[in-house]
Amino acid sequence: MTFHLSSLFSSGGSSNPQACASFSIRPAPWDGTKILVHQTGYPIDSPPMYSITISSSGKSNVVVSRGWGGGPWDVVGDARLPTFSSKIHLTIHGQPTEMRFSEMSGNSSFPTPSMGKLKWKLDSMSTKKMDLLDESGRKLAKVHSGKASGEKILDILIPHDIFFLEVVLLSAWANKAQNKTALEASGEVIGAVLGA
């Protein structure tokens, strides 16, 4: 499996790229453990393209599944978040890779077979925004807040295939989950120091 690169290296870069595809990512109102992925404009009760499950227990902490994610045959990929390490273990369609996470910046980077190293970079002003950059610093995708409560919007800014979308979804939500875990751990340490 390789990434779709046909138009990736075309000339005509823009300082303000427009989305090639936009996805609405919202918590499922009837299931607090699921996050649903739809193309932007679809109602929350329509069948999702993907569902994301985030768990603090178990072997896989972030799981991306096709549709509602009814069984193991629907699983696209999963991420195992570290307890005492900076390496997030990703598996997508059976292919393992490691994503390196920086607690100082909240950024993470991971290798891809055909695009080199990609990096999720948190906005320095808001942890609600993050950009996916390639090695040259070109923005490939971005995640930002949507209009509805709890909604995130994923904009993919380059021509892509389904595999690239799945890599983006898994790596983005693994990074978000690890940032949340690191923030909670920092809060506990500060609380322990102040309480002592």
Task: Give residue ranges: language-model regions.
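Low-complexity or membrane-interfacial segments used for flexible interactions
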Residues: 1-44, 48-49, 107, 114-196
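Acidic, polar low-complexity intrinsically disordered regions
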Residues: 33-127
